[in-house]
Amino acid sequence: PSVRRQRQMCIRDSVTLCWHWMAPTQTEGKRHFYTEKTDFNLKQALENPGSAEYQGLLHDIDLICAELQKLQEAGVPILWRPLHEASGGWFWWGASGPKAYQSLWSLMYDRMTNVHGLNNLIWVYNGQDPKWYVGDERCDIIGDDPYYTNGSRVAYYFDSANANRFKTCYKTSQNKMIAMTENDFLPNLNRMFQKNTKWLTFCTWCREFVCVMDESAGWGVTTPEYSGKYASADELRTVYQDERVVTLERLNGSGGYGYACAG
């Protein structure tokens, strides 16, 4: 959504933002966030601060900061989740390994915090591997995106609290809250509490994970109809109405939508 729309949506709430950063490559037709669709080499860019690629990193960060500044001026706190799912390698910011990723995170953190003075960002690390961790001093929350292979309900029923993924996050740092920053199936609240895997938040992804796709309207467009593939309308209501889940509506009476906190 546009910054104006974000401000309208979140004037009394918080918002979560994830940046699908198009690689600042100089090759025409190669600006993309998927590793396989770009020729951008993060390691080489970071090793050559005078290069067009490195300057491209700074340029893009500065552009994003200008937009985030508008939300700061509007008093909107942001759960800021950049450079997500890095250890998977499918995004260019994770394709050069953990050291390059950590350097890029530090560059972004320093520029946003110390150069642009952004203080409304709650930094969410989503590298999904303890070896990639950026350090307690440069993030506030640890996030994980537990998708089940091929949308398997069998796998979901086997570990519907995502306990193993939670434990991996805990190994990353014992000083941070742990959030389910993306998910397909809804977390099983009873299992969560039984296994003491109390995710701070969950965020069911869009598109077919909730609604039926509208193929005629373009990529990512959905109809108002629930798909039922990952969560039926009844399942959604059951989880969101559970007294153990704190929605924004319950938190401040705003009637807004967004993250649900399992407390």
Label the predicted regions.
Residues 176-263:
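Substrate-binding cleft of secreted/luminal carbohydrate-active enzymes
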Residues 1-11:
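Single conserved hydrophobic/aromatic residue that forms the stacking wall/gate
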Residues 81-83, 87, 105-131, 175-186:
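Aromatic-lined carbohydrate-recognition surfaces of secreted/lumenal glycan-active proteins
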Residues 42-79, 104-116:
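An active-site-proximal structural segment forming one wall of the substrate-binding cleft
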Residues 60-96, 126-128, 137, 142-146:
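Active-site groove signature of glycoside hydrolases
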Residues 129-156, 203-206:
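Aromatic- and acid-rich polysaccharide-binding/catalytic face
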